C-alpha cells in the first residue's frame, strides 16, 4: 500500500516559491492499477517522484506498507527503491547495450550472480514477448518493443510497485493498446501494484481500477474509474471524459434536429444491470408516450455495462413529466438540450 498523507512539495525558483503538489492525501491499495491524470503542470510527475524519494515532501509524508519512506536511512532507501520499478515516456534505454544487456543492468548493479542474471533475463524476455530480440540493440527496435524492454528492465529486481511516467505518450494507438495489455498482465500475473500518470483518459479507461484527477498541484477528484466516468463532479474531469466519450450530438446534428421540429433532449445514464433492462420502453409505454434515441451507446467499463443515451419524448406534456419523474427514481436523467435554446 502507498499512502500520501497531506503531502506538499514546494520548489524555490530564484526568489519565487512554487507549490507543485498541494496537500495531497491518497491511498493506493496493494494490487491496484491507480491512474493519476492531469494536464501539463498539474503536479503529476512531482507526485510520482515522491514515492521513491527522488523528490522529498516539503510537508506531509509518503508511506509504503506502513513505513514512512522519508525517514529511511540511505541504505534502507536503496533497498526500498529496488522494489520500485519505473518506466518512462522516452524509454531511457542504453543505446550501447543489447536488449538482454539493458534488462540485466539493474541485476548486475545489485550484485546478482551471472547464472541468476541469465535465467532472469530469459524469463523476462519471454514474459514481454521479446525472446527473439535478446541480441538486438535499441535502435533496431520499434517504439513498442523499446517500451517492452523498459518494462522488462523495471521488473528485473522483482519489484512490488511499478511506476509508469507517461509510458504510452510516445506510442501510436495500436502500440499503446498492446503496452496497456502488457501492463494489465504485469498486474494480474505478478500481483504488482501499478501507479501511472497520464494526460490521456483512454489509458485510465482501459486499465485503471481507480483514478485521481490533478489540477494546479491538487487532487480535485478521485475514486474508482466506473463512478468517476459515470458521475464526474469536477469540470476538469468532465473535460477529460469528453475526450474519449462524446456526450452530445454535434452542433450540426443539433441544428438539424431543431430545424426538423425536434423536442427537448434528455441524457439517460444506465449503470450495471440497468443498462440491459427495458426501462425506457416499459415506462413510456405505461404513459402512452413515444421515445426516440437520438444518440448514445452502451459499453463495458470495469467489467460493468454503462449506457449513455440521448433521447426525446413525444406525446402529452403532462405524461412526459410523469415519465421523467418515474425514470428519476431508477436511473440518472437530465435535460441537456432545449428546443427553445
From Swiss-Prot:
Subunit structure: The complex is composed of two ATP-binding proteins (MetN), two transmembrane proteins (MetI) and a solute-binding protein (MetQ).
Membrane topology: Peripheral membrane protein
Tree of life domain: Bacteria
Protein name from the UniProt record: Methionine import ATP-binding protein MetN 3
Function: Part of the ABC transporter complex MetNIQ involved in methionine import. Responsible for energy coupling to the transport system.
Residues that, per the record, bind ATP: 38-45
Matching InterPro entries: AAA+_ATPase, ABC_transporter-like_ATP-bd, ABC_transporter-like_CS, ACT-like_dom_sf, MetN_ABC, MetN_ABC_transporter-like, NIL_domain, P-loop_NTPase
Keyword tags: Amino-acid transport, ATP-binding, Cell membrane, Membrane, Nucleotide-binding, Translocase, Transport
UniProt domain ABC transporter: residue ranges: 2-241
Enzyme class label: translocase
Catalysed reaction equations from the record: L-methionine(out) + ATP + H2O = L-methionine(in) + ADP + phosphate + H(+); D-methionine(out) + ATP + H2O = D-methionine(in) + ADP + phosphate + H(+)
EC number: 7.4.2.11
Subcellular location: Cell membrane
Any one GO molecular-function label of the UniProt entry: ABC-type D-methionine transporter activity
Pfam family, one: ABC_tran
Record carries keyword Nucleotide-binding: yes
Family of the protein in this entry: Belongs to the ABC transporter superfamily. Methionine importer (TC 3.A.1.24) family.
Amino acid at each position: 500500500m502507498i499512502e500520501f498523507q497531506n503531502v506538499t512539495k514546494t520548489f524555490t525558483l530564484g526568489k519565487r516559491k512554487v507549490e507543485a503538489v498541494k496537500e495531497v492525501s491518497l491511498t493506493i491499495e496493494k494490487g491496484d492499477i491507480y491512474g493519476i491524470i492531469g494536464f501539463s503542470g498539474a503536479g503529476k510527475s512531482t507526485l510520482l517522484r515522491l514515492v521513491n524519494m527522488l523528490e522529498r515532501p516539503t510537508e506531509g509524508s509518503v508511506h509504503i506498507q506502513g513505513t514512512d519512506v522519508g525517514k529511511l536511512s540511505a541504505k534502507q532507501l536503496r533497498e526500498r527503491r529496488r522494489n520500485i520499478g519505473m518506466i518512462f515516456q522516452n524509454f531511457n534505454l542504453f543505446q550501447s547495450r543489447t536488449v538482454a544487456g539493458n534488462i540485466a543492468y539493474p541485476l548486475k548493479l545489485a550484485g546478482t550472480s551471472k547464472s541468476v542474471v541469465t535465467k532472469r533475463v530469459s524469463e523476462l524476455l519471454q514474459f514481454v514477448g521479446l525472446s527473439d530480440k535478446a541480441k538486438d540493440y535499441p535502435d533496431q527496435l520499434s517504439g513498442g518493443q523499446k517500451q517492452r524492454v523498459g518494462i522488462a528492465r523495471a521488473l528485473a529486481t522483482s519489484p512490488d510497485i511499478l511506476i509508469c511516467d507517461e509510458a504510452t505518450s510516445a506510442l501510436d494507438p495500436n502500440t499503446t493498446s498492446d503496452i496497456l495489455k502488457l501492463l494489465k498482465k504485469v498486474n494480474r500475473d505478478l500481483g504488482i501494484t501499478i501507479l501511472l500518470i497520464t494526460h490521456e483518459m483512454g489509458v485510465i479507461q482501459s486499465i485503471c481500477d481507480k483514478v485521481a484527477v490533478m489540477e494546479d498541484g491538487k487532487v480535485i477528484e478521485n475514486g474508482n474509474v466506473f463512478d468517476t466516468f459515470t458521475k464526474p463532479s469536477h469540470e476538469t474531469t468532465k473535460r477529460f471524459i469528453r475526450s474519449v466519450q462524446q456526450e452530445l450530438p454535434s452542433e450540426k446534428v443539433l441544428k438539424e434536429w431543431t430545424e426538423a421540429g425536434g423536442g427537448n433532449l434528455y441524457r439517460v445514464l444506465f449503470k450495471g444491470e440497468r443498462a440491459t433492462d427495458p426501462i425506457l420502453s416499459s415506462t413510456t409505454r405505461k404513459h402512452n408516450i413515444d421515445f426516440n434515441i437520438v444518440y448514445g451507446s452502451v459499453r463495458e467499463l470495469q467489467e460493468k455495462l454503462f449506457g449513455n443515451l440521448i433521447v426525446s419524448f413525444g406525446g402529452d406534456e403532462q405524461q412526459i413529466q410523469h415519465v421523467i419523474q418515474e425514470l428519476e427514481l431508477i436511473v440518472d436523467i437530465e435535460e441537456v438540450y432545449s428546443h427553445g435554446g
